Each structure stands twice: as structure tokens, then as C-alpha cells.
């Protein structure tokens, strides 16, 4: 993770690295939750923005990587999901199980037909119907803290014919244990977290959005937005 890189660099340079935070503004690029006995689920939608594609055409795109950190050595369940927002129903789930050690560091991608590049890519009919692009997942264990963290990598464009009203949205769902905490960070301008006003989904926040880069021993962090 990036905090380890900063520690190594600061030691080699015999210097302190100053991180200026604050450029996140009010973008909801972070999400945090401490689970309690009667609420062990964190779910949020991955949102993006309109971008130019193929000349003057515009498309609603979410892209980039999101990292989700546990606060201890325990595994947590994380899935990327497709939700029918009109019915508030998850219609598809994607997962690289964190409970199976053979999956440590393994990437798995699901994609639409026009984005399939590798033999290991899985062409998913539901994803292909409503989106163009891909969603990838992986997890590993931090070698210093021994905390587990997962990454979701997306490039997703809503299908202009079957999903023109953004009825079907991509999100994620995390299930943990009582007392466990998970912190997630998105790619700011290209991906944020939102509940879209739908019951049972968690909203993103700008709080804590400087990410784990500020936790390095050789850094000083100034100017946090919140």
C-alpha cells in the first residue's frame, strides 16, 4: 500500500514527506462503517459522471479502483452487485471469496462482450445486458499490519438502450462481524459512493478521504477537508 512506499522513500531521503489534503472537496469518495450485532452489512452504489465518448457523444461512466480495508486480521465478505433500483433488488453478485486462501492476490474480471480480452475474463449475461465495460475484484493481506483489504476495479458505461434511465446500477455489499470496521476509498472524480436515496444503502462521505497514505510514519498531513 502507498503508506509503505512513503515510509521507504522518507527513510532513503532522510526527510519528512508533507501531504497536502483538501482537494477532495465535498466529493463522496470515502465510506466507513463499524458493524454492530444487528447491522453487519455495508452497501453503497458506485457512481461516476458524464464524460465525452466518440466525439460529441456523452456517456455516464464510472471507472477506477476502490480499496476496502478491514481493521483487523479477520476476513470480511465483499461482493460487487448489480441492483434494480426501482425494486431495490440485487439481481447479480460477483465475488472472490476472502475465506479461501487460494484466492489471495488473485484477480477475477467479469465483463461485457465488447470488453473481453483474456481467457480468464468471464462474460456475464446480466452485466452485458445493462452495461458496457468490466468489474474486477481481488483481495490480499497487508504485509505490515496483516489487515485484509479488497479492491474493486471498474470501467462501466450504462447501456443506452437497455439501461438509459440508470435503473440498473453497480454497487458493492460488505458483510462483517460485530465490532469489525471497514473503510473504503474511491477514485474521486471518476468514482464516488452514494446511496441514491434508496433504503438500506449507505451514503458516501468526504470525511477521512485522504486514505491510508497519511498513516505512514515518515509523513506529515496538513489541510484535511473535514
Whereabouts are the PLM-identified features?
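Loop-rich non-cytosolic ectodomains and luminal regions
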Residues: 1-226
Amino acid at each position: 500500500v502507498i503508506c509503505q512506499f512513503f515510509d521507504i522513500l522518507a527513510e532513503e531521503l532522510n526527510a519528512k514527506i508533507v501531504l497536502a489534503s483538501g482537494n477532495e472537496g465535498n466529493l463522496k469518495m470515502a465510506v466507513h462503517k463499524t458493524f454492530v450485532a444487528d447491522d453487519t452489512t455495508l452497501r453503497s452504489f458506485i457512481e461516476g459522471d458524464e464524460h465525452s465518448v466518440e466525439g460529441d457523444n456523452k456517456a455516464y461512466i464510472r471507472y477506477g479502483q476502490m480499496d476496502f480495508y478491514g481493521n483487523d486480521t479477520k476476513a470480511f465478505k465483499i461482493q460487487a452487485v448489480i441492483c434494480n433500483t426501482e425494486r431495490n433488488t440485487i439481481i447479480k453478485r460477483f465475488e472472490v471469496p476472502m475465506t479461501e486462501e487460494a484466492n489471495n492476490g488473485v484477480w477475477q474480471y467479469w465483463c461485457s462482450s465488447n470488453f473481453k480480452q483474456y481467457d480468464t475474463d468471464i462474460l456475464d449475461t446480466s452485466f452485458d445486458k445493462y452495461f458496457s465495460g468490466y468489474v474486477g475484484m481481488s483481495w490480499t493481506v497487508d504485509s505490515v499490519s496483516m489487515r485484509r483489504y479488497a479492491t474493486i476495479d471498474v470501467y462501466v458505461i450504462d447501456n443506452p438502450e437497455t439501461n438509459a434511465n440508470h435503473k440498473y446500477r453497480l454497487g458493492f455489499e460488505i458483510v462483517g462481524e460485530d465490532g469489525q470496521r471497514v473503510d473504503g476509498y474511491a477514485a474521486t472524480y471518476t468514482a464516488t459512493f452514494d446511496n441514491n436515496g434508496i433504503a438500506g444503502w449507505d451514503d458516501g462521505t468526504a470525511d477521512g478521504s485522504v486514505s491510508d497514505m497519511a498513516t505512514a510514519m515518515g509523513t506529515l498531513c496538513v489541510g484535511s477537508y473535514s
